[in-house]
């Protein structure tokens, strides 16, 4: 045997060995998959949302589009945290759909609207099947705009296969064996699995089928069966999502440094009382005093019309706040700088929740000492993250908590001026009426952490 033939033989043998090894790994993986659809009934599943129809035929779940109804979801009765999900699906050339993972339906969130991660089924020319969309929350997190191999992997009008891994904060997807998405996101770690029949609007076609089969899970010893992905991870922590970039949002904090921020009463960032660690900006516990340690911090820039979002996490009994339209020149003495405040508070343990010149106006998400947030608001437990969202355009202001609007008001209105006149701010001239001001994170001497601090501004032409 010549050297060339020997090399060819070795290469061929190695190739066959690799194929056999991969096949054995795939078979071992399949041996540990457990069906969550019995092939005959919809036992273990229920519908949420709209009124699209689901039925079982020939071992397949078939969802059918219906006119004049919102998105419909067939979801598992059980919820899952870490898992590997494999399934087959088929749709026509126009009907968008998706597979929900770690999704939820809570009474407090938009009257039970299904929300959470969706692995997209996209038969359009865009071909983003396998991308990760955040249903009824943040929209696109990992589209396939920069992944042509995954786009080409989708087979129109034919059966396709998804592999989906959800482990900790990491989500990975494959379509027909081709890596599609690799996302690192901390928002939701548990929820149901769901099969979507998308609403079709006025122009869509009713009676179109979307079909799924071989829906199987691994939930035990999941780490043993993970597959490596060559795709670089899209990390959302302290970064702008795809949709945020398209929508004109900017980072207000870079997740690493103090750039863009200073002390409210000094020109530099405080040397003590604040800490940056693992992508979190924390005001430290120093005894519960108002601005007595490091002091409040503010943006160096001032803002007029804007939206700002801040993820915050409190400790037991903690007090803090997000202030806006702040004038740092107003109060150079003791205490916090003056501005409108989105209250951050442990309502159950901090006495401030029962104080104030207007009932309930010092509870979490309220306009501090002026307007109470909706008492039915949902606050995640101590130690978990919550999202504050403040919208201020043309003096019309809204406070949102965890995706739900909890109050609104108009700066400068008769009602607003009356509330100010009855509050602790009655002696501050033009309180809350400035055209623009700083945004502030409050030091109230309790441990509170912040991340994902983002802003969207509106210019004169957009007002």
Predicted regions span which residues?
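Carbohydrate-interacting regions of secretory-pathway proteins
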Residues: 25-463
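Bacterial Sec-dependent N-terminal signal peptides
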Residues: 1-31
């Amino acid at each position: 045997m010549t050297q060339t033939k020997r090399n060819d033989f070795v290469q061929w043998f190695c190739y066959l060995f690799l194929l056999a090894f991969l096949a054995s790994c795939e078979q071992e993986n399949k041996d540990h998959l457990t069906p969550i659809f019995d092939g005959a009934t919809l036992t273990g599943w229920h519908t949420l949302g709209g009124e699209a129809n689901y039925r079982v035929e020939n071992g397949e779940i078939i969802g059918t589009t219906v006119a004049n109804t919102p998105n419909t979801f067939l979801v598992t009765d059980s919820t899952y945290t870490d898992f590997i999900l494999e399934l087959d699906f088929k749709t026509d050339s126009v009907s968008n759909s998706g597979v929900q993972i770690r999704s939820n339906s809570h009474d407090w969130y938009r009257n039970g609207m299904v929300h959470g991660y969706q692995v997209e089924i996209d038969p359009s020319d865009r071909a983003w099947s396998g991308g990760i969309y955040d249903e009824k929350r943040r929209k696109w997190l990992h589209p396939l705009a920069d992944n042509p191999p995954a786009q080409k992997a989708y087979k129109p009008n034919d059966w396709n296969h998804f592999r989906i891994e959800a482990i900790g904060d990491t989500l990975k997807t494959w379509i027909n064996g081709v890596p599609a998405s690799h996302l690192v996101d901390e928002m939701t770690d548990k929820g149901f699995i769901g099969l979507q029949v998308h609403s079709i609007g006025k122009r869509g076609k009713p009676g179109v089928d979307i079909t799924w089969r071989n829906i199987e899970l691994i939930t035990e010893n999941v780490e043993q069966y993970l597959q490596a992905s060559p795709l670089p991870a899209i990390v959302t922590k302290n970064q702008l999502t795809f949709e945020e970039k398209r929508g004109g949002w900017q980072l207000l904090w870079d997740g690493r440094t103090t750039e863009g921020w200073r002390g409210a009463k000094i020109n530099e960032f405080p040397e003590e009382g604040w800490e940056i660690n693992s992508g979190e900006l924390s005001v430290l516990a120093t005894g519960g005093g108002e601005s007595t340690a490091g002091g409040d911090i503010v943006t160096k820039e001032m803002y007029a019309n804007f939206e700002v979002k801040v993820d915050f996490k409190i400790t037991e009994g903690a007090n803090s706040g997000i202030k806006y339209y702040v004038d740092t020149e107003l109060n150079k003495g003791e205490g916090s700088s003056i501005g409108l405040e989105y209250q951050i508070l442990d309502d159950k343990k901090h006495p401030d929740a029962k104080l104030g010149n207007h009932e309930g106006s010092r509870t979490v998400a309220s306009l501090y000492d002026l307007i109470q947030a909706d008492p039915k608001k949902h606050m995640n437990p101590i130690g978990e993250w919550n999202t504050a969202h403040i919208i201020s355009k043309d003096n019309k202001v809204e406070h949102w908590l965890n995706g739900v609007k909890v109050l609104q008001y108009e700066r400068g209105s008769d009602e607003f001026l009356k509330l100010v006149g009855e509050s602790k701010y009655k002696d501050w001239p033009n309180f809350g009426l400035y055209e623009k001001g700083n945004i502030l994170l409050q030091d109230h001497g309790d441990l509170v952490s912040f991340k994902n601090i983002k802003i969207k501004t509106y210019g004169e032409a957009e007002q």
